[in-house]
Structure formats: C-alpha cells, structure tokens
A protein has these predicted regions:
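Conserved small/polar residues in nucleotide/adenosyl-binding loops
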Residues: 1-5
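Glycine-rich beta-strand-centered segment in the early N-terminal region that forms part
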Residues: 27-46, 59-105, 122, 141-142
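Cytochrome P450 core scaffold surrounding the K-helix E-X-X-R motif
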Residues: 50-56
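NAD(P)H dinucleotide-binding glycine-rich loop of Rossmann-like/cofactor-binding domains
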Residues: 78, 93-206
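Glycine-rich Rossmann-fold phosphate-binding loop(s) that bind the pyrophosphate
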Residues: 161, 211-214
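Adenosine-nucleotide cofactor-binding segment
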Residues: 183-212, 224-268
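Residues forming the Rossmann-fold NAD(P)(H) cofactor-binding site
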Residues: 217
C-alpha cells in the first residue's frame, strides 16, 4: 500500500512508501458503538495547517501520542473525497480519533486532544479503512455517469474544516449566552429567554479573528452570515493587497490589520 506518513524523525518527518493499513474499530460519536471500517480508495485529499503542525511535531520527536494503536506512524491528510467500491459511490470522509471536550459540554470520562485526527490515519494512501457512518453522502447532482468533477472535489475537501467552524461558532454562542444573560436581564429588564437571545447576539458585536487561513476565513464568513451587523477584524501576516485578504474582507464585510513582525518586541 503506497502512502505518505508522518513519523518521529528530525531528518525525515514526512516519508513516502509502502505501509500496512489496519482496520481499527472506531465510533462516530461518543456513546455509539465502535464499528469496523470498510475499504475506500482516496480520490482527492487536503493538506492543511494541522498536517504542517503534525509534521513539525514529528521533526521534534513529539508525535507518539498521535499514532494509531500499534503503529509508529500517522498517515496524514485528514479531509477529502474517496471512492467506496462496496457501495459504488463517492463519499466525503470525516476522521474522528477519540473524544474531545469544550469547556461548556465535556463530561468526566472525556479526554482533551488538540487535533481530531489523534490516533486516526488520514487519506494519503491508496486506500484505507473508514467507519461506514463517517463516509458522508455527496448531494445529488454532483456525480454524473459515475464520475465526479475535479472542481467539485476541490470544494468538497473543505467540508470538514467548514463543519469545524460551524461547531466553533455554536460554542461561542453557547458561552456568550451563558456568561452574560443575567447581566442582560438586569440591563434590559427582560425575561431570561429574551436576555439569553440578546446575550448570544451581542457576543458577536465586535469580533477579532487572528489568522487568515482556511478556518479563519470560514469562521468570519459564518459569523457574518448569522450576524450581518457584527464588526469583524482579521489580524494576519498577508499583504493588504493580496487576493486572499480582499476576498475575506468582501465575504465577511470585515476590516483588516496586518501583523507581520518577527518578534514579540516588534509587535508590541
């Protein structure tokens, strides 16, 4: 099986070659049963900032806790599109390794992890095993005569990070509402239900987003869609005239501050 993988190595944190794949049972959501995976073939795979971070962790020898059980490597590329031979269909893959928590919802049996791909291989191999419940159906109309356009795959590869940002916006809504509704009850002399709604909306009156990568642009767009009056500021290193900055500002109705300093002293 040909693949691209991360390993703990100062000289070669990212390597290519043959690898053995493992059918490790996984669950879709906490509380559900674990299921063995089914084979799917990689079609289009994304390489994101998380992959870059994992590669650097391997260079520093800190990747062991990310390896799947019984392995000394992690296949990278944790979002993309695959072909499922047994079901004769294309699918979007979601990768989930372990249980995460956020401060408002975690329970005592959950453990924190930085990346959803903890101990779960990605798609940068010819094929691999995936939980069948994590092979999401592609909407009708995109696949024609058994083929899917490359242009569509390029968009679908962003499904997973976009979903992550929907989740993060919801968490910000939860936290803002819970933190401030009593203040709003006193301020506006209103009911608890009305105060919670006010607190949720006012959480996004002023928003500062650090970083203008994929997730930064996505969360800005999602906040603007839900709260069009939000004053959004992006802070990033890109030139003000770059196409990425222009696109993000137009999409989110935002303003921009460039922070291109090499040291904290220069930034201050």
């Amino acid at each position: 099986m040909y693949k691209r993988q991360f390993q703990n190595s100062e000289e070669k944190p990212l390597v290519y070659g043959d690898v053995e794949i493992h059918n490790i049972p996984r669950r879709r959501l906490r509380g559900e049963e674990e299921k063995e995976g089914i084979i799917a073939e990689s079609v289009f795979v994304g390489f994101c900032g998380t992959d870059y971070t994992l590669m650097n962790m391997g260079r520093e020898g800190n990747l062991k806790q990310k390896f799947p059980e019984g392995c000394n490597r992690l296949i990278n590329g944790h979002e993309g599109v695959v072909w499922v031979p047994d079901e004769n269909r294309f699918a979007i893959v979601l990768i989930r390794g372990g249980n995460s928590y956020d401060p408002t919802r975690y329970t005592e049996e959950e453990t924190y992890f930085e990346y959803g791909c903890d101990q779960a291989d990605g798609l940068f191999s010819d094929k691999n095993y995936y939980n069948p419940d994590m092979l999401l159906k592609i909407p009708d109309g995109y696949v024609k005569d058994g083929k899917i356009p490359l242009s569509i795959c390029k968009k679908l590869v962003f499904s997973d990070p976009y979903a992550c940002m929907i989740f993060q916006r919801e968490r910000m809504e939860d936290i803002g509402e819970a933190q401030n509704f009593r203040v709003k009850m006193a301020q506006y002399k209103c009911s608890e239900a009305e105060a919670r709604e006010i607190a949720r909306k006012e959480t996004f009156d002023r928003v500062c987003i650090f970083g203008l990568g994929t997730t930064g642009m996505f969360i800005g767009d999602l906040i603007h869609q839900r709260y069009p009056d939000a004053k959004i500021v992006f802070v990033a290193r890109s030139e003000e005239s770059s196409p990425k900055v222009s696109f993000a500002l137009k999409q989110a109705g935002a303003s921009y501050v460039r922070s291109a300093f090499d040291t904290n002293e220069e930034l201050a």
